[in-house]
Amino acid sequence: MGAAMAMFRKRLMREPSAYPNQRITFLDQYMLRELAKDYKHFSGGRKCFKFRDFFAEHFIGTAPIESATHKKWYIDVDHLYACLFINGDHWVALDIDLPMKRINIYDSIPHLTTKPEMARQCMFLREMIPAMMSAMVPEEIRKKSNARLEVKRIKKKVPLNKDPGDCAIYTIKYIECLALGTSFDGLCVENMKAIRIKLAAELYDEVRETARPYELDMCREEIRIPQLEDSP
């Protein structure tokens, strides 16, 4: 998943960019995991909590170095796209809409997670992202507010994973389509084999040399990319 998000960031940096809306970014998977880890300390004492420089680098778009966008959240970015791993066995796509103060969730198997549980799984983002903006965005640009982000599950015209096992692919394709401003037409079980092969080829071609090892491991484990080597 990390490799896919790195690929999308690299595409965002191209001139011309394929993305019609340039006020977007794709969150790094390692940063999300670190944010979730720090949530315990954050929720235990917000007044004493200070975000690490690591998070500031991601906030201003200078990290990850190999796919830095140099876009600052809220100032240059309205939408943060993210892949969230929930319940230890399922991926969902997030469109974190900063101006609307809302996390839009795209879930290929929605019956697996109740609405309250999904809200709980997103809690570290709902609380820490507003706090990051309050700490890192000048008050003349954004009035300080630590109010939780709302959560909304998007269901209309969202294709479902009727053959469970491809939630990671659906998640990546949701994010790609949202960023491109296109519909989800063609994202279905009948096309899944072709989608897998195309995605594997794109990842191999665009990020194999710059993606960090854990990103490739995540991708290999969750997406099960087919081998591309020539047969003996």
Where are these regions (language model features)?
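Enzymes acting in ubiquitin/UBL processing and closely related pathways
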Residues: 1-232
